[in-house]
UniProtKB/Swiss-Prot annotation:
Compositional bias per record (Low complexity), positions renumbered to this chain: 217-231
Post-translational modification Phosphoserine, affected residues: 127, 219, 223, 225, 231, 240
SUBUNIT field: Interacts with ARF1. Interacts with PICALM and clathrin heavy chains.
Zinc finger C4-type: from-to: 28-51
Molecular function per GO: GTPase activator activity; zinc ion binding
Signal peptide extent: none
Every Arf-GAP domain range: 13-137
Top-level lineage group: Eukaryota
Name this polypeptide is given: Stromal membrane-associated protein 2
Subcellular location per the Swiss-Prot or TrEMBL entry: Cytoplasm
Function: GTPase activating protein that acts on ARF1. Can also activate ARF6 (in vitro). May play a role in clathrin-dependent retrograde transport from early endosomes to the trans-Golgi network.
Keywords carried by this UniProt record: Cytoplasm, GTPase activation, Metal-binding, Phosphoprotein, Zinc, Zinc-finger
Length: 429
């Protein structure tokens, strides 16, 4: 190879490299794959290696394939490639290709498409002469390609022209913005009421009427609330209920009783309503209708219980048992004569036969009874004289410092003697 031929090869390679830089030549003319490195120089198209194998199978009379880098090119071959190219060749061989046609990707389908395109010339415009198309239309395609960039530049110019129009658009709402504020103020009605109130005094009158209506509506509610408060018992009246139950009222309570009489009917009813939870405490001072001996001693008759308040507070005689159904009451029970002596010895832990605090714990607040009371016959009827008992109880000391029976105080001094003297058999009738 001479030096002249080496220079020609380098020059041809440079021409092919420039042709591959064109946008249409960057993709295969048949399958549109990227980066074709082969060419069919008699047709004038750049193709991929897969399509190059199919072109070889078509035959040399249809397609002649060369490698861009591996084969040597001649001036005639380079001239054919310059005259056609992928874009111009597809306009000739794909003139009647449907717009919705999708290029195949499978080898078998690609081979069928290539044979239809170049061998059968199925999509080719047969009215055109290929040689005339290469020479004559070569300049036309170049001229057609030259104004194309000018048309592309035109929209850029129009965009520059439209830019000032876009600037004017935001100025329109700025001018109309102060006009739009006026109806907003009218809708709120901030200005109109002020002028009307200054011109005419009717607005203030209407407001006063509205306030009067509100006051008239609120007045019945206040009266109802006053009635409800009046009907409810006051804390003073509620707190005075336990004072009515006091057994030993103080002299100052008389003035309170006179003030209580002046209460209305509603307050009296409320007092009775608040007194209902304390009814069980009154039952402790009530006596049953009759206390009978148990069935084990049918020979002894029943004994009528005391009707006075002090009867329930006094300790029962020996042989009395609790009767079911009567709260806080006991019934007498006959005991043998021999049992009485042991009863006195076991139950009486203090002089004069007084009961100990442990044995009389359920009888808290009860008065001490003399020993002679335990000798009463079971068949006798027990009757208490209310007037005598109240006088005697006034002189007795029931409670000590700790709230329990003060046996020491009652046994010492004249109190103990008075108790033994006052509670004499004269009481029993």
């Amino acid at each position: 190879m001479t030096g002249k031929s080496v220079k020609d090869v380098d020059r041809y390679q440079a021409v092919l490299a420039n042709l591959l830089l064109e946008e249409d030549n960057k993709f295969c003319a048949d399958c549109q794959s990227k980066g074709p490195r082969w060419a069919s120089w008699n047709i004038g198209v750049f193709i991929c290696i897969r399509c190059a194998g199919i072109h070889r199978n078509l035959g040399v009379h249809i397609s002649r394939v060369k490698s861009v880098n591996l084969d040597q090119w001649t001036q005639e071959q380079i001239q054919c490639m310059q005259e056609m190219g992928n874009g111009k060749a597809n306009r000739l061989y794909e003139a009647y290709l449907p717009e919705t046609f999708r290029r195949p990707q499978i080898d078998h389908a690609v081979e069928g498409f290539i044979r239809d395109k170049y061998e059968k010339k199925k999509y080719m415009d047969r009215s055109l002469d290929i040689n005339a198309f290469r020479k004559e239309k070569d300049n036309k395609w170049k001229r057609g390609s030259e104004p194309a960039p000018e048309k592309k530049m035109e929209p850029v110019v129009f965009e520059k022209v439209k830019m000032p129009q876009k600037k004017e658009d935001p100025q329109l709402p700025r001018k109309t913005s102060p006009k739009s504020k006026a109806p907003v103020v009218d809708l709120l009605g901030l200005d109109a009421p002020v002028s009307c109130s200054i011109a005419n005094g009717k607005t203030s009158n209407t407001l006063e009427k509205d306030l009067d209506l509100l006051a008239s509506v609120s007045s019945p509610s206040s009266s109802v609330s006053r009635k409800v408060v009046g009907s409810m018992p006051t804390p003073g009246s509620a707190g005075s209920v336990p004072e009515n139950l006091n057994l030993f009222p103080e002299p100052g309570s008389k003035s309170e009783e006179t003030s209580k009489k002046q209460l209305s009917k509603d307050s009296i009813l409320s007092l009775y309503g608040s007194q209902t939870p304390q009814m069980p405490t009154q039952a402790m001072f009530m006596a049953p209708a009759q206390m009978a001996y148990p069935t084990a001693y049918p020979s002894f008759p029943g004994v009528t219980p005391p009707n006075s308040l002090m009867g329930s507070m006094m300790p029962p005689p020996v042989g009395m048992v609790a009767q079911p159904g009567a709260s806080g009451m006991v019934a007498p029970m006959a005991m043998p004569a021999g049992y009485m002596g042991g009863m006195q010895a076991s139950m009486m832990g203090v002089p004069n036969g007084m009961m100990t605090t442990q044995q009389a714990s359920y009888m808290a607040g009860m008065a001490a009874m003399p020993q002679t009371m335990y000798g009463v016959q079971p068949a006798q009827q027990l009757q208490w004289n209310l007037t005598q008992m109240t006088q005697q109880m006034a002189g007795m000391n029931f409670c000590g410092t700790n709230g329990m029976l003060s046996y020491g105080q009652s046994m010492n001094g004249g109190n103990g003697q008075a108790a033994n003297q006052t509670l004499s058999p004269q009481m029993w009738k």
